[in-house]
Structures are given as structure tokens and as C-alpha cells.
Amino acid sequence: MLLYNVTVGIDKDKEQEWLDYMTNKHIRDVMNTGLFVQSKLYKVLHDQEDGTISYSVQYFAKNIEDVQQYLEVFAPVLIEEHRKKFVNRHIAFRTLLEEVKFDG
């Protein structure tokens, strides 16, 4: 299992608008690609001194090919839509993680 994690810092005064957009549109658009099997949204529980609130948006994929297809075919348009809607009001970084299985 792979985890494509997007951590977003959003200005406090745009937080509710951003949450509405993410939960009603963006996350659904990503999931509707059919390339991820599950998504989760977490709020980061520490105060930011720069006036932002941080969230982790997590998308789970079965294999690297699905993630690569998403990044090549769908991500450019979806990222640009998000950027335009919240221009100069957010920062985002993306991380791809592979599950490490162990006993315990």
C-alpha cells in the first residue's frame, strides 16, 4: 500500500472555505479518478506562528503505477484549480510513502 500525502498550510481566515472546497469538491475529484482506494483528512494539532492552520490530506493507492498515472494525468489540473482558488493563501507539499510491514 502506498500513501500519497499532501500537507497544506492554509490561512486561518480561509480555513472553513478551504475545508468546504476540499470535502465537497477536491477530494471527491481525486477519488473519482479511480486510482486511490481510500482518502483521509487530518488536522495537524499544533499552532502555527505564521497565522496558518495545517492539514494532512491522505490518499491510499494499491501500487506505484496508480500514483504515477494520477500524477501525470490528473494532478496537474487539480493542483492548478486548488492553487487558483487559494492563491497566496496556502502552501502545500507532497510526500509519497510506502508501507513497511513488520510484526508488532
Region spans (language model):
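Short, well-ordered beta-strand segments in beta-rich or mixed alpha/beta enzyme
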Residues: 3-9, 42-73
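Intrinsically disordered, low-complexity acidic/polar segments
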Residues: 15-17, 48, 66-68, 103-104
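Short amphipathic alpha-helical segments
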Residues: 15-40, 78-80
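A short, structured loop/turn motif at beta-sheet edges
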Residues: 32-33, 62, 103-104
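A generic structural signal for secondary-structure junctions
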Residues: 35, 72-75, 83, 87
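Glycine-rich beta-strand-turn "strand-cap" elements at beta-sheet edges
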Residues: 40-50, 81-104
